[in-house]
Amino acid sequence: MNKPTQEIAGGNGGASISHSALGALAGFYSAWGRRTMLQGGVLWFDCGAFSTMSVLTTVPTGIADREVRGILSRTRKLAAVYRVAAGAGLEVPMFVLRDKEYSPSNLQRQFRQHVERASSFLEARECSWEEWETCALNCDRQTLARQGGFPQPGQGLLCPSVRRRIAGAARAVPRLRIHACFHGKEIAAYLIHVAFGEMCEGLLAHRVDSEIDSPTRHASHLLYFSFARATISDPDIQAICVGRQSIPAKESLTRFKRHAGFLPEPCHLRFRLHPLLAPFLENGFSAALLKRVRVGLSGKIPALANLEVMEQAGLCSRR
């Protein structure tokens, strides 16, 4: 029996990702410590305290509402956020590069200067999973600490046995690779990406903390430029996506991606609320109340910034 596939949005001539590849990717995320499931032909993982999200930005889903409500009931998440075809849902930008002649001229001027400075101290290239296991420990430790990752899922990322398991799961995913910036033998920043059809999609990026005068200060700038230039030059790749605008939006990250030469393209999201919450929150009054709580208290309780997902779910759930 043939396994189902999903069509990629905006692919040149159309492209698809197989059910088996999604299953392997689910295994990778699970090894990483993310609560993950493959349901309705869609790969989902937990996103923040309140929601679950479809993983691939460039792959619109055709999942039925009843399946999404079932997922929310089983996972006890309050909201689901997932990609849908154009013409439905809420439109947000995703950041895509299609220029096969990508070069420093694509970069914003200051971004280009940061790349030039970083290239004097750092080496950017594809790296092996064996290198990642041993050379990215400090990078992962600092990223987890910055994200408040202790004692949340992900702490095991620093354990040698967990890293071996992650590397093993990664090798099972077709065309899953790492691009990294090295400072000596240490990885200062890296980006994990996967290719399917003619699309390459960035999945996960970590970096070290850097002081103003540190040689690793602009590792992420060099990383994105080197990754984009190496990947778009592959004749099998016609486009690279480095994710969509987050909810809540992070303007600094949006600006970084645009300055790196990635251009906004429309991405349509659908929001669905848990069946027990939907009757109470699917209205403008509830969304406004949630916004007042979020704006008033998120400065003191940062996790409340994620209430914006609930606001959007209440406002957009009928789309």
Name every feature range the model reports, one short phrase each.
Residues 2-47, 82-89, 97-215, 230-231:
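A conserved beta-strand-loop-helix scaffold within acyl/acetyltransferase catalytic domains
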Residues 2-27, 31-44, 85-104, 235-319:
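Active-site/acyl-donor-binding loops of N-acyltransferases
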Residues 60-62, 132, 244-250:
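Acidic-and-aromatic substrate-binding clefts and catalytic sites of carbohydrate-active enzymes
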Residues 53-57:
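Long, charge-dense tracts
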Residues 59-94, 99:
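Non-catalytic accessory segments adjacent to catalytic cores
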Residues 61-71, 159-165, 220-226:
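Well-ordered, non-membrane alpha-helical segments in soluble/globular domains
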Residues 168, 173-281:
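Aromatic (often tryptophan-rich) hydrophobic motifs at membrane interfaces
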